[in-house]
């Protein structure tokens, strides 16, 4: 029995509210159960220096958590003077994941920055950030297309992410914190809307896992991604 009472293959409730910020070119608030992440997309009219005169654009991401996103207060990283290794790892993952769904030549020499701010954390914040970040990116690109700034759509497919793991000896979909903190195996799966894999991160936290178990987790992830892509489409109308 999962702590939440969910079935092994049951996602948490998912909602994506678009256009929640006035100034950002694209934004949304994604809720996956009790994990809530505010995602925004900002368009910058020049690429990073290493892409100057290449004709290619760039998508990057920044990630952070509010001090009371968790059960006890975490000190702001700005106050500490540096980002944690975890934060740097997560924002690089978000950027890599979203770039995989973009034709950077069609984007032109500009950069889109995705900001993911965790308002409340209950497991799966990086996955929620990728799924919501894609919606913010899609909305920002729509504005470029509508304004005639770019002529071809650079977004080639949906991108979404979900966690899966082995909890109490059973493969489960979409781990919350109670499960994630005690799972024997933990994994994050980033897929396209056509179930093509972008990134798979799996690790044995308490016990090693078999190839068959990995396949079971991938099957769960594909089903979960299909639900998340449906939520993305519903948010965009």
Curated annotation (Swiss-Prot):
Phosphate binds at residues 86, 124-126. The keyword Flavoprotein does not apply. It comes from the Bacteria. This is Ribonuclease PH. Keywords: Nucleotidyltransferase, RNA-binding, rRNA processing, Transferase, tRNA processing, tRNA-binding. Transmembrane segments: none annotated. PROSITE patterns: RIBONUCLEASE_PH. Belongs to the RNase PH family. GO terms for biological process: rRNA catabolic process; rRNA processing; tRNA processing. One of its GO terms (molecular function) is 3'-5'-RNA exonuclease activity. The gene is rph. The keyword Electron transport does not apply. Phosphorolytic 3'-5' exoribonuclease that plays an important role in tRNA 3'-end maturation. Removes nucleotide residues following the 3'-CCA terminus of tRNAs; can also add nucleotides to the ends of RNA molecules by using nucleoside diphosphates as substrates, but this may not be physiologically important. Probably plays a role in initiation of 16S rRNA degradation (leading to ribosome degradation) during starvation. Homohexameric ring arranged as a trimer of dimers. It holds the Pfam family RNase_PH. It catalyses: tRNA(n+1) + phosphate = tRNA(n) + a ribonucleoside 5'-diphosphate. Its EC number is 2.7.7.56.
């Amino acid at each position: 029995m999962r702590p939440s009472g969910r079935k092994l293959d049951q996602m948490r409730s998912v909602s994506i509210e678009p256009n929640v910020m006035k100034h950002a070119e694209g934004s949304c608030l994604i809720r996956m159960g009790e994990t809530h992440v505010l995602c925004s997309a900002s368009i910058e009219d020049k690429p990073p220096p290493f892409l100057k005169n290449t004709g290619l654009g760039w998508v990057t991401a920044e990630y952070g958590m509010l001090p009371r996103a968790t059960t006890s207060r975490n000190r702001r990283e700005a106050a500490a003077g540096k980002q944690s290794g975890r934060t740097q790892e997560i924002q690089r993952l978000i950027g890599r994941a979203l770039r995989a769904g973009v034709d950077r030549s069609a984007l032109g020499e500009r950069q889109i920055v995705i900001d993911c701010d965790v308002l409340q954390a209950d497991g799966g914040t990086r996955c929620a950030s990728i799924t919501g970040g894609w919606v913010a990116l899609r909305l920002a690109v729509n504005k470029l297309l509508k304004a005639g700034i770019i002529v071809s759509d650079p977004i080639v497919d949906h991108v979404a992410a979900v966690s899966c793991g082995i909890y109490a000896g059973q493969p489960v979909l979409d781990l919350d914190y109670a499960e994630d903190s005690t799972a024997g195996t933990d994994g994050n799966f980033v897929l396209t809307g056509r179930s093509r894999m972008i990134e798979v991160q799996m690790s044995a936290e308490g016990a090693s896992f078999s190839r068959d178990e990995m396949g079971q987790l991938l099957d769960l992830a594909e089903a979960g991604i299909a639900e998340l892509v449906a939520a993305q489409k519903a948010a965009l109308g």
